[in-house]
């Protein structure tokens, strides 16, 4: 089942989500939108197992990173009615 990982611009660049991911889905990339000058990126979403550890680790109360599981994806992102 395919999962989607969405990184929002509320990311503070702390790397907590990257360190929490057991399958190395996330990585940090350069970004000038925060003090840390980096933002999380999800280049390997095909490896996501849907554990949502990245959400739990996020100090912004998972406002910066969200994992949408399979069919939950379109509903949660407001793409289905």
Swiss-Prot record:
Keywords: 4Fe-4S, Chloroplast, Electron transport, Iron, Iron-sulfur, Membrane, Metal-binding, Oxidoreductase, Photosynthesis, Photosystem I, Plastid, Repeat, Thylakoid, Transport
Subcellular location: Plastid, Chloroplast thylakoid membrane
Gene Ontology MF annotations: 4 iron, 4 sulfur cluster binding; electron transfer activity; metal ion binding; oxidoreductase activity
Cofactor-binding details, from the entry: Binds 2 [4Fe-4S] clusters. Cluster 2 is most probably the spectroscopically characterized electron acceptor FA and cluster 1 is most probably FB.
Needed cofactors: [4Fe-4S] cluster
Reaction equations catalysed: reduced [plastocyanin] + hnu + oxidized [2Fe-2S]-[ferredoxin] = oxidized [plastocyanin] + reduced [2Fe-2S]-[ferredoxin]
Enzyme Commission number(s) of this protein: 1.97.1.12
Keyword Repeat: yes
Superkingdom field: Eukaryota
Domain 4Fe-4S ferredoxin-type: 2-31, 39-68
Membrane topology note: Peripheral membrane protein
Gene Ontology cellular component list: chloroplast thylakoid membrane; photosystem I
Binding-site residues, [4Fe-4S] cluster 1: 11, 14, 17, 58
Transmembrane regions listed in the UniProt entry: none
GO biological process: photosynthetic electron transport in photosystem I
Main location: plastid
InterPro entries found in the cross-reference section: 4Fe4S_Fe-S-bd, 4Fe4S_Fe_S_CS, PSI_iron-sulfur_center, PSI_PsaC
UniProt-annotated binding residues for [4Fe-4S] cluster 2: 21, 48, 51, 54
Function, as annotated: Apoprotein for the two 4Fe-4S centers FA and FB of photosystem I (PSI); essential for photochemical activity. FB is the terminal electron acceptor of PSI, donating electrons to ferredoxin. The C-terminus interacts with PsaA/B/D and helps assemble the protein into the PSI complex. Required for binding of PsaD and PsaE to PSI. PSI is a plastocyanin-ferredoxin oxidoreductase, converting photonic excitation into a charge separation, which transfers an electron from the donor P700 chlorophyll pair to the spectroscopically characterized acceptors A0, A1, FX, FA and FB in turn.
Subunit: The eukaryotic PSI reaction center is composed of at least 11 subunits.
Name of the protein in its database record: Photosystem I iron-sulfur center
Gene from which the chain derives: psaC
């Amino acid at each position: 089942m395919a999962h989607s990982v969405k990184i929002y611009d509320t990311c503070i660049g702390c790397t907590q989500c990257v360190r929490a991911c057991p399958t190395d889905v996330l990585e940090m990339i350069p970004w000038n939108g925060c003090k840390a000058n980096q933002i999380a990126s999800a280049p390997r979403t095909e490896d996501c197992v849907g554990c949502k550890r990245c959400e739990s680790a996020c100090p912004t109360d998972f406002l910066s990173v969200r994992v949408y599981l399979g069919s939950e994806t379109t509903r949660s992102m407001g793409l289905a009615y």
